[in-house]
Structure formats: structure tokens, C-alpha cells
Swiss-Prot record:
Name recorded for this polypeptide: Solute carrier family 25 member 35
PANTHER family: RE38146P, SOLUTE CARRIER FAMILY 25 MEMBER 35
Reactions accelerated catalytically: a dicarboxylate(in) + sulfate(out) = a dicarboxylate(out) + sulfate(in)
Renumbered ranges of Solcar repeats: 1-90, 100-193, 203-294
InterPro entries reported for this sequence: Mito_Carrier_Antiporter, Mitochondrial_sb/sol_carrier, Mt_carrier_dom_sf
Organism in which the protein naturally occurs: Mus musculus (Mouse)
Species lineage: Eukaryota, Metazoa, Chordata, Craniata, Vertebrata
Compartments where located: Mitochondrion inner membrane
UniProt keyword terms in alphabetical order: Membrane, Mitochondrion, Mitochondrion inner membrane, Repeat, Transmembrane, Transmembrane helix, Transport
Record's GO cellular component terms: mitochondrial inner membrane; mitochondrion
Bilayer topology: Multi-pass membrane protein
SUPFAM superfamilies reported for this sequence: Mitochondrial carrier
Length: 300
């Protein structure tokens, strides 16, 4: 039941935040491996990107990739949050005093994140391809021209096999390890602190909401460079064998980005990342916490 509730919670958040994921993806691909000031900026900021995409591609384009995004969230976060919740409910993450151990929470979050992300990697790759697709006048990054999720998965599988479907999976793991461990560690620790300080009534939904807000800030700062690199790894063009033509791996992507675009190139789209990850983290963790509380109350 933990896995089902976790997947449902993540999907609920995804419906609201997917347009921000589209904006974030395009801002991260804009000016790829080009020095600042040498390329046309189709998307100047989050709000301009929303306006531009809606105007040129149509309002429906703001929900591009929603199908694979929902499937990925259900698979990835169902496994990630479900596994973490199982470990938490059995007391593996607590100290002798009954509070969450930051080290154990971070380790459990990282391990759970790796399992979920690796399984869902082909879906995430196709989601990235679909969200990057745009009209030629505002296109950024490589354009794959997929017709949909199933067509894309079938085409990639036929051309490059399982290796092609899981291309970029290993390179995407540092993003998830850092993001998941930061998110779940800060969420659990802040919940403990708020409960100890008795700022809100015991078992109040405000505790989960406040902890999720803090967790959202932490995850964006820690994860954005790896998120930029991961997006580019998944979206890069490939040769006939399915091998990437621009980056050899996550470290190469980070180094090339920093060398060509500067330090802030690794933080491209951080505003969009927070507008997306902030609400997504808040909503998914809040829904997850409330569903678990409801289930535990009902089960008893």
C-alpha cells in the first residue's frame, strides 16, 4: 500500500507541475555548449518561456510529455517513497531517541531513489525528448520529432535495443541520489524539529507542508547542476549504435557546460527548477504524508 500511495501522491503533484517541467527542460537546453551572448535567447525567464511556448506552440504544448511524466512519477516515486516509507515505518531510520537519523535518512533516500530512477529511465528519456520538441522558431537542443511515448519507446528499442532505452540511465543516477537523499533527509529532519518546537499542533498538516517547503529549496540548490547535465545527456543526438555524440557521461557533461557556459551555465533554469521542484516537492510530500496518515488512521 505504501508503494501505491506514493505513486498516486507523485502523480497528483505532476499534473500541476508538468508545465513547469516543460519550461525547465527548454531553458536547460537553451544555448547548449555556447558561450553566453553568442546565441538567441528564446526564453528569457520562466514567465517569458510560458508566454512564448503558449503563443508559438499553443497552450497544449505546456503539457507536453504529460503521459510519460505521470508514468515516470508513478514508477519512480512509487518505488522511492514507498521503499523509504517502509524503512521508516519499521524504525530503520530512527535513532535511540526516536528521531530521524540524518545519515540513515539520506542513505535510504539515495538507495530508494536509485532503484526508482533506474527502472524509470527510459520513460524519463522519452519525456525529455517530447518536452524539448518545439516549433522551429523557438526550438532548443536536439529535436527528435517523436509522435508519442509508445512510438518513441518502440522506435528507440528497435534501433538500439535495451542499451538504447537505458541510455543515460547511469549518468542520471547522481541527479537522483543527490536529489532524493537531500529531499527525504531534510523533510524528515525538519518535521522532527517542528514537532519538537511545537510550532504547530501535533499531527497537523502544517508540519508536513512547512517541512516540504524547506525541502524544496534544499533539493533545487543541490540538484540543479546534475539536472542540467542529465537533461542534456538524455536529449543529445546519437550515432547509429545509439551512442551519444556530445557527451561521454555525467562528468563530461558537467565539465563541458562549465567550461563553455561558465559556472552559472550549470544552474541554467534554476528559477524554473524551483518553480517546478518547489511545488512538486511540496505537493508530492504533502500528499504522501497525508495519504499515509489517513491510511494509518483508517487501518487502525
Amino acid at each position: 500500500m505504501d508503494f501505491l500511495m506514493s505513486g498516486v501522491a507523485a502523480c497528483g503533484a505532476c499534473v500541476f507541475t508538468n508545465p513547469l517541467e516543460v519550461v525547465k527542460t527548454r531553458m536547460q537546453l537553451q544555448g547548449e555548449l555556447q558561450a553566453p551572448g553568442t546565441y538567441q535567447r528564446h526564453y528569457r525567464n520562466v514567465f517569458h518561456a510560458f508566454f512564448t511556448i503558449g503563443k508559438v506552440d499553443g497552450l497544449a504544448a505546456l503539457q507536453k510529455g504529460l503521459g510519460p511524466a505521470l508514468l515516470y512519477q508513478f514508477l519512480m516515486n512509487g518505488i522511492r517513497l514507498g521503499t523509504y516509507g517502509l524503512a521508516e515505518s519499521r524504525g530503520y531510520l530512527h535513532t535511540n531517541e526516536g528521531t530521524h537519523s540524518p545519515v540513515r535518512s539520506a542513505a535510504a533516500g539515495a538507495l530508494a531513489g536509485v532503484m526508482g530512477a533506474y527502472l524509470g529511465s527510459p520513460i524519463y528519456m522519452v519525456k525529455t525528448h517530447l518536452q524539448a520538441q518545439a516549433a522551429s522558431e523557438i526550438a532548443v537542443g536536439h529535436q527528435y520529432k517523436h509522435q508519442g511515448m509508445f512510438q518513441a519507446l518502440t522506435e528507440i528499442g528497435q534501433k538500439h535495443g535495451l542499451v538504447g532505452l537505458w541510455r543515460g540511465a547511469v549518468g542520471g543516477l547522481p541527479r537522483v541520489v543527490i536529489g532524493s537523499s537531500t529531499q527525504l533527509c531534510t523533510f524528515s529532519s525538519i518535521k522532527d524539529l517542528l514537532s519538537q518546537w511545537e510550532i504547530f499542533p501535533p499531527q497537523s498538516w502544517k508540519v508536513a507542508l512547512a517541512a516540504a517547503m524547506v525541502s524544496g529549496v534544499a533539493i533545487v540548490v543541490a540538484m540543479t547542476p546534475f539536472d542540467v547535465a542529465s537533461t542534456r545527456l538524455y536529449n543529445q543526438p546519437t550515432d547509429t549504435r545509439g551512442k551519444g555524440l556530445m557527451y561521454r557521461g555525467i562528468l563530461d557533461a558537467l565539465l563541458q557546460t562549465a567550461r563553455t557556459e561558465g559556472f552559472f551555465g550549470m544552474y541554467k533554469g534554476i528559477g524554473a527548477s524551483y518553480f517546478r521542484l518547489g511545488p512538486h516537492t511540496i505537493l508530492s510530500l504533502f500528499f504522501w504524508d497525508q495519504l499515509r496518515s489517513f491510511y494509518n488512521t483508517y487501518a487502525k
